[in-house]
């Protein structure tokens, strides 16, 4: 591998005023066991770990003091989220509680508008983001690929966005490639992390090839037959997609073009003519 390729793989993810060595963020819910979560984290080396305050109770496998102690031991920055909130006020309150519990200004902002699709509430989301940003939070809003919504979130002070690929937990991959690619094209300087709906590593590679800055995963890893191996696969896929983007892929063509050029006559024609 050349020096150029090595530096491309090592290029950092920049969110707000911080730099991260990985472009993969990992959720911490629904793993078969705390040990499988710990092993998956070590396998993929994520930039951040998302944690829902509402799940941190002693009665859940991923809850309690032991879980929090394990996260601290891993040394990976924690990104609390407001999962399960259905209003701006509810999300605001939970974010404030998360700041106290996890001692961080980072928040993955979720305000759900529909129980069936878990689609973000496009009206409440900017309102909640604006209030939290005024309070000094570094807000990463879970949103759709809607360009107008994304611009509104930027207008209220968000400096990075997390559009979905598909509804949470479906594993369908990008259901609106046109919308995601258009969003990347129209917001070229904004950090964009695809959050929700990715199911297999090739989905991560695809969005990274489109120019997205990172991916956030949970169910695709936690519910895999081998979460540790899948975490490693997603890490490699994310790097591959990023490197492919930086390498400048060849343009698509409508007609075939020979990869081996033919210059002049075949050598046996030349020998025959000279005889």
Swiss-Prot record:
Pathway membership: Cofactor biosynthesis; thiamine diphosphate biosynthesis
InterPro entries, per database record: Aldolase_TIM, Thiazole_synthase_ThiG, ThiG
HAMAP family associated with the record: ThiG
Entries under SUPFAM superfamilies matching the protein: ThiG-like (SSF110399)
Molecular function GO labels: thiazole synthase activity
Subunit structure comment from the entry: Homotetramer. Forms heterodimers with either ThiH or ThiS.
Residues noted as binding 1-deoxy-D-xylulose 5-phosphate in the record, renumbered to the chain: 169, 196-197, 218-219
Keywords tagged on the record: Cytoplasm, Schiff base, Thiamine biosynthesis, Transferase
Entry-linked Pfam families: ThiG (PF05690)
Enzyme active site: 108
Catalysed reactions, as listed in the record: [ThiS sulfur-carrier protein]-C-terminal-Gly-aminoethanethioate + 2-iminoacetate + 1-deoxy-D-xylulose 5-phosphate = [ThiS sulfur-carrier protein]-C-terminal Gly-Gly + 2-[(2R,5Z)-2-carboxy-4-methylthiazol-5(2H)-ylidene]ethyl phosphate + 2 H2O + H(+)
Family listed: Belongs to the ThiG family.
GO annotation (BP), single: thiamine diphosphate biosynthetic process
GO CC, alphabetical: cytoplasm
Signal peptide limits: none
Role this protein plays: Catalyzes the rearrangement of 1-deoxy-D-xylulose 5-phosphate (DXP) to produce the thiazole phosphate moiety of thiamine. Sulfur is provided by the thiocarboxylate moiety of the carrier protein ThiS. In vitro, sulfur can be provided by H(2)S.
EC number: 2.8.1.10
Protein name, entry field: Thiazole synthase
PANTHER family, alphabetized: THIAZOLE SYNTHASE (PTHR34266:SF2)
Disulfide-linked positions: none
């Amino acid at each position: 591998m050349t020096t150029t390729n090595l530096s491309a793989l090592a290029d950092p993810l920049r969110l707000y005023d911080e730099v991260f060595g990985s472009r993969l963020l990992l959720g911490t819910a629904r793993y078969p066991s705390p040990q499988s979560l710990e092993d998956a984290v070590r396998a993929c080396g994520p930039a951040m770990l998302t944690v829902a305050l509402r799940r941190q109770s002693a009665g859940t496998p991923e809850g309690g003091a032991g879980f929090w102690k394990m996260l601290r031991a891993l040394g990976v920055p924690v990104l609390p989220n407001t999962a399960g909130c259905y209003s701006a006020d509810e999300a605001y309150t939970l974010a404030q509680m998360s700041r106290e519990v996890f001692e961080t200004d980072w928040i993955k902002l979720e305000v759900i508008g529909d129980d069936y699709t878990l689609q973000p509430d496009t009206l409440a989301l900017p309102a909640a983001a604006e209030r939290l940003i005024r309070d000094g939070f570094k807000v990463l809003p879970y949103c759709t690929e809607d360009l107008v919504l994304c611009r509104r979130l930027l207008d209220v002070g968000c400096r990075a966005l997390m559009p979905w690929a598909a509804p949470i937990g479906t594993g369908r991959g990008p259901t609106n490639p046109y919308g995601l690619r258009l969003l990347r094209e129209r917001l070229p300087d904004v950090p964009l992390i695809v959050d929700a709906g990715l199911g297999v590593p090739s989905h991560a590679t695809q969005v990274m090839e489109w120019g997205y800055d990172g991916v956030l995963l949970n169910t695709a890893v936690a519910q895999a037959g081998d979460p540790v191996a899948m975490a490693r696969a997603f890490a490699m896929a994310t790097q591959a997609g990023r490197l492919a983007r930086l390498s400048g892929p060849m343009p698509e063509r409508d007609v075939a073009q020979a990869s081996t050029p033919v210059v002049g006559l075949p050598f046996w024609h030349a020998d025959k003519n000279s005889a």
